[in-house]
Swiss-Prot record:
Keywords: Cleavage on pair of basic residues, Hormone, Secreted. It is found in: Secreted. The keyword Cell membrane does not apply. Residues 12-49 are annotated as: Disordered. It holds the Pfam family Motilin_assoc. GO terms for molecular function: hormone activity; motilin receptor binding. It comes from Equus caballus. This is Promotilin. Belongs to the motilin family. Plays an important role in the regulation of interdigestive gastrointestinal motility and indirectly causes rhythmic contraction of duodenal and colonic smooth muscle. GO terms for cellular component: extracellular region. The gene is MLN.
Length: 92
């Protein structure tokens, strides 16, 4: 399954990710203000414990007409098989 997104859908997804990032940074800022009364060494240790988790894999979509699809079919099949192989190897 290869998802195909329009440009406006990609923009919407990017905007959602930016909003999530802004909310997270605001939460971190509020926490750091609350923790501000701690010893500076404790604050540094607290910063070192932060873990960043990715919420979703990156997806790229494109549109092709039938002529373009015929022209690039072999290359697309090769890319797809590489991705599927690497996914299967990572799952093992």
């Amino acid at each position: 399954f290869v998802p195909i997104f329009t440009y406006s859908e990609l923009q919407r997804m990017q905007e959602k990710e930016r909003n999530r990032g802004q909310k997270k940074s605001l939460g971190l800022q509020q926490r750091s203000e609350e923790v501000g009364s701690l010893d500076p060494t404790e604050a540094a240790e607290e910063e070192g414990k932060e873990v960043i988790k990715l919420t979703a894999p990156v997806e790229i979509g494109m549109r092709m007409n039938s002529r373009q699809l015929e022209k690039y079919r072999a290359a697309l099949e090769g890319l797809l098989s590489e991705v599927l192989l690497s996914t299967q190897n990572a799952a093992k």
